[in-house]
């Protein structure tokens, strides 16, 4: 793994670590009782370590001196230490699990809330696999900042100090051996933590890319099969997987070197202490029991330093994970409340686009000084070539994107003055690509209006001409439709989406090629249903079929972000212009009542 100056600078960047900890700290504070308990058990564990060494030394001296009365008195203490140790380990482990699991739960909910409140363009410009990776790889990698590791960052220095002071109490001369261990362990731990943090950052990034690859494979499985792309996608994933293996092996190698080196240092300290101690014992300056207690503790003296370096490396690894989700969590929104559904909706709303200018990237403008007025309760169809901006108008009207200049009005109120709840309650939308959620047909329909009665549900389904089909299924409205409605045809999904829009009962209706997936017979039936719900509602239609748009109040034609034609179908089809060009129809051959599909 190549390291550069930026990696080294980042490792010692206090602001970066403080920034990451500022995200975690409120969650730690929320569960302070659990961490207070962990601190109590931390101190208890240190006392048990020292008490065990004292017990071993005292028991050894009693045995050497033949003081069996003392031995008998010490045995109950041994069982007491075992019991306290058992309870400490059990409670400590359980409370740690409660704390870490609760914090991960809270963090996942906080992350999802932020994403659900995010502007649509931020979600659209981020790969779904990367977003999912935040909830899996990243959050599952923060243990180093919230779990046992965090407690050990406090415990291990205290344990080292306690052991060193106790060793100095037993033999000041021998305790100096431990002083030589400190600089070696600290330097080794710093290097280890630096290397592990950088490789961990690369692993998290690579895991995100692999999750994205898998997401694309499963979502585009039909295309992969149709175009014989199995080998290509498998090779891409295998290459990523091999890179991940290389990084994991690198981490394993570094850990092996570090822990093996730590054990070697501990063994050297043990042998030196044992040899020097034997000399001191032979001169009567130390008892055998004291030497045994010293050697036992000196062997553990390396553990806090060795462990501290490892825990610090884990902390750094967790910092890398928090860095990846920090940009999402730190965004401040005007409200943290989700939009709420409202039953009370006015029946008619006028729409206005006034001198509106919009660009997705700030360079290529989709609309420049665009103006359009739609009277309340009227219906219009938008026609234009691919890329003219038809769907962009829908995105702007729903508040998914904001214009760079100008304003969009509903009645006389600017969109910017409406809350998300107010705006979304005014609009029912049937997208070009129908999306149904995993669950039953009933659950998908009720998403539009949770307070829908059974009668209203059936009425909407009948209006969309989907009721009879639903009843023909073995479980009717309780039929599970699979992921994205995979068990249904395109037309069936489209009609469920239309029924869902009917149930929302909003004053503004947006139909983005809402009948594109229907056959001619079903389209005729749905067209009748749409004509019914379009009455007294302001409706905007994007369509490719003549039958869908010929009965609207007005058709507008846009090209390069400008309104270039408007009028009824009968007028526009006989006028030279883009509308007639897109229709590919000779006006002299078109009868007034023909129901012919045209490409618009």
Residue ranges and their predicted role:
Residues 1-48, 64-77, 92-96, 100, ...:
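Membrane-integrated ABC transporters
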Residues 2-14, 101, 109-133, 137-139, ...:
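Short intracellular "coupling" helices and adjacent cytoplasmic loop segments at the cytosolic face
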Residues 30, 34-45, 58, 76, ...:
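Transmembrane helices of ABC transporter permease
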Residues 29-30, 120-121, 137-146, 150, ...:
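An intracellular "coupling" helix at the cytosolic face of ABC transporter transmembrane type-1 domains
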Residues 229, 253, 301-328:
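Cytosolic ends of transmembrane helices, especially the final helix of ABC transmembrane type-1 domains
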Residues 78-89, 182-189, 255-269, 288-310:
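Hydrophobic alpha-helical segments in the permease module
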Residues 94-98, 102, 106, 169, ...:
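Cytoplasmic juxtamembrane "membrane-exit" helices immediately C-terminal to transmembrane segments
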Residues 344-600:
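ABC-type nucleotide-binding domain
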